[in-house]
UniProtKB/Swiss-Prot annotation:
One of its GO terms (molecular function) is voltage-gated chloride channel activity. It is found in: Membrane. PROSITE patterns: CBS. It comes from Schizosaccharomyces pombe (strain 972 / ATCC 24843). Residues 527-587, 617-674 form the CBS domain. InterPro entries: CBS_dom_sf (IPR046342), Cl-channel_core (IPR014743), ClC (IPR001807). GO terms for biological process: chloride transmembrane transport. It is a multi-pass membrane protein. Voltage-gated chloride channel. Keywords: CBS domain, Chloride, Chloride channel, Ion channel, Ion transport, Membrane, Repeat, Transmembrane, Transmembrane helix, Transport, Voltage-gated channel. This is Uncharacterized chloride channel protein C887.02. The chain crosses the membrane at residues 38-58, 107-127, 215-235, 245-265, 292-312, 329-349, 380-400, 402-422, 433-453, 457-477. Its main location: membrane. GO terms for cellular component: chloride channel complex; early endosome; Golgi apparatus; plasma membrane.
């Protein structure tokens, strides 16, 4: 990791205040907050329209795996089958399995699935590598202060178009992926591009990240038709990031962006009701306190299995990390082949749609007169076996697919797996105790419990399920399920699946204070003065600056009082480079040349030129006494958002502690957990694992 990979939030706040007038741009009669509010509203409208388009396209492509609409080939199965016969049959939709032999219909089903998976891999990995996977882990790290190597690639028109199409094909292929996580990346891409229309507004790292947080909220809101849940989702993700207090100002932008996206989505749905995700779930009866123990059991079971999914997913990620580009493509095709064969077998035997986008609403809804699936027409033990089998297969397929070379999301697969587990348990209990709540309620409880175990979210999930299902009468069971599931999963695996991927990609990520514990004193790896490049504050020669730039890759240099070890401050590498580039014109440059030559000749002549660095010192330098308790040092990094801290001994430099060093230290502690001190690497004493969990 490099020192310049993280943002110094205090310095950014300083620069923001200093350049407020410059950021005002051409529309000076509008305040900055008004301009960013307008950007949030405009972006939210585009996000809502994009969500409507992608939902419709994904649903249409998904229908082609089963057949096509004879009335209009551009109608998906749900639209085509809006009117049923007296026998609850859909005559307008041409099903492959009803009009061809088993072999031919299976061949068509599998071929379409594999073809869609290949297209998704080509678009989301070969054409635009930045479009692969979920996007939420990287965006969460960016919001925490991570400087993505090339933001203009991660947020670009090419990435936006490729990921938008790729996520539709990946979902339509039947793979166990969701589109909600990738859509968060799509939403942040939209707001980033809208902000870039006004370059004067795009210079602030703080405001840019506040808008990205608003887009994250809007992406979830548009995906689930849950504006309040989207806002809380973004806030809960930001609460576990470094310097979360910085984003308190983003709540307003999140609300505006989420509300405008859902309004745009609802306007489209007003004349095309099938656009969007779920709007309402029918639960068969109310719950009672007799259901509390089964709810607790389901929550514990989902907490354990969610941790198993994270463990297996990271194992698959480690195995496929060294794959070539061709190998990654073939791996996705192989997953699609296995998934489609399994789905077709389950579809033929039980009429159960084995893909998370359709399985989840099937499982959490009560049986209707038109229901012909195994959930409603067979004995309880057959239903339970099919549901448990579906959950187990879904868990294995999701753990192998999430993070593969296509746009992948974890939210809907987790909901589907948990719903199968919950309804299976409810079915078994209902057969023995008829007075218990309906099986669909158990499905909802299982879905939120499993999702909580994989993402470690609590409040956001409860609100999203409220808005998604309309089931306000099960508020208490939902809250109980998320809490128990999170506690259980925290005790098994420390990180959420998002933070596990942040660590897997070696992205520098500094969690919040709630994610840290201290059992014994810490010994942080402090950089000694001998390890640092030191420059004099007065009469610093060009040769010293050039030597510092050449001999060190550090993002900062230490400035000391001349001929002493007294600390004066930090100077950034960029500032030194800037000084060297404009040294002939620097007003703060002192020269001893008195030859009277013209500037061009003087620049090429041997001149003893020096700089006074006082005016170029980092204006937000933080210092502490060298014997300050490490807990307080860590608190300063977390609460102030700084990246470098100078440790002094009576004004003299004792060493420098950086945020990157703390992150590396924590990783080494985690690697050697359980070892004796004699087995740890030399140079630093690792006394405890300071990261208890990376997502709270």
């Amino acid at each position: 990791m490099k020192d310049d990979q993280l943002i110094d939030w205090i310095h950014e706040r300083y620069e923001e205040q200093k350049s407020a007038n410059r950021l005002a741009g051409r529309f000076r009669f509008l305040g900055l907050e008004t301009k960013y509010s307008i950007i949030s509203i405009i972006s939210g409208i585009f996000i809502g329209l994009t969500a409507a388009l992608l939902n419709a396209l994904a649903s249409l492509l998904n229908s082609f795996r089963e057949g096509y609409c004879t009335v209009n080939i551009l109608f998906d199965k749900q639209t085509c089958c809006s009117t049923l016969t007296e026998d609850y049959e859909c005559q307008e939709f041409f099903f492959w399995r009803n009009n061809h032999s088993v072999f031919v219909s299976c061949l068509i089903y599998v071929s379409v699935s594999v073809g869609f998976a290949f297209i998704a891999t080509t678009l989301g990995y070969v054409v635009a590598p930045a479009a692969r996977a979920s996007g939420i882990p990287t965006i969460k790290a960016i919001l925490s202060g991570y400087k993505y190597p090339d933001m203009n690639v991660f947020f670009s028109i090419k990435t936006l178009c490729s990921k938008s199409l790729a996520v539709c094909f990946s979902v339509a292929s039947g793979l166990w992926v969701g589109k909600e996580g990738p859509f968060v990346h799509i939403a942040t891409n939209i707001i980033y591009l809208v902000e870039r229309i006004a370059p004067s507004l795009a210079d602030s790292e703080i405001f840019t990240r506040q808008l990205l947080a608003a887009a994250m909220a809007s992406g979830i809101a548009a995906s689930f038709n849950a504006p309040v849940g989207g806002v809380i989702f973004a806030l809960e993700q930001l609460a576990s990031s470094s310097f979360p207090s910085l984003f308190t100002g983003s709540i307003w932008y999140e609300f505006l962006c989420s509300a405008s996206s859902v309004v745009a989505l609802q306007l489209i749905r007003s004349w095309h009701t099938d656009v969007g995700y779920l709007s309402y779930v029918s639960l068969d009866r109310r719950w009672s306190y007799k259901d509390t123990l089964p709810f607790i059991f389901i929550s514990i079971l989902c907490g354990c299995l969610g941790s198993v999914l994270i463990y297996l997913n990271m194992k698959f990620a480690s195995k496929t990390k060294g794959f070539s580009k061709i190998s990654n493509v073939f791996f996705v095709i192989f997953l699609s082949l296995i998934t489609s064969l399994t789905a077709y077998a389950i579809l033929g035997e039980s009429e159960l749609l084995f893909n998370p986008m359709e399985l989840f609403p099937q499982v959490i809804n009560s049986c209707s007169p038109s229901s012909s699936t195994v959930l409603c027409e067979t004995t309880f033990w057959v239903t339970a076996i099919v549901l448990f089998t579906s959950a187990l297969l879904g868990l294995l397929l999701t753990s192998a697919t999430f993070g593969a070379a296509i746009p992948t999301g974890i939210i809907v697969p987790s909901l589907a797996i948990g719903a199968c587990i919950g309804r299976a348990v409810g079915t078994l209990l209902k057969s023995r105790f008829p007075s218990l709540a309906g099986t669909s309620i158990y499905g909802v409880i299982g879905s939120i419990a499993f999702l909580s175990s994989t993402t470690r979210l609590v409040v956001a999930l409860v609100v999203i399920l409220f808005e998604l299902t309309g089931a306000l009468n099960i508020a208490l069971p939902l809250m109980l399920a998320t809490l128990i599931s999170k506690w259980v999963s925290d005790s098994i695996i420390e990180t959420s699946i998002y933070d596990a991927w942040i660590q897997f990609r070696n992205i520098p990520y500094f969690p919040s204070s709630n994610s840290l514990k201290f059992s014994i004193p810490l010994n942080f790896p402090v950089r000694s003065p001998e390890q640092l490049v030191r420059l004099p504050i007065r009469s610093c020669s060009i040769e010293e600056l050039e030597r510092a730039m050449h001999d060190s890759s550090q993002s900062f240099f230490v400035v000391l009082k001349n001929d002493t070890e007294f600390f004066e401050g930090f100077i950034s590498r960029n500032k030194v480079s800037e000084l060297l580039n404009r040294r002939p014109m620097s007003s703060n440059m002192q020269t001893t040349d008195n030859t009277g030559l013209d500037p061009l000749r003087s620049a090429s002549a041997p001149v003893d030129s020096t700089f006074d660095l006082f005016d170029y010192i980092h204006p937000t330098t933080f210092t502490l006494n060298y014997d300050t308790p490490p807990v307080l040092m860590l608190k300063l990094f977390k609460d102030a958002g700084i990246t470098n801290l100078a440790l002094l001994n009576h004004g003299k430099l004792h060493g420098v502690l950086t945020k990157i060093d703390i992150i590396e230290y924590a990783k080494k502690c985690k690697t050697h957990t359980g070892n004796t001190y004699s087995e740890l690497p030399t140079g630093v004493t690792y006394e405890t694992d300071i990261f208890n969990r990376a997502d709270d």
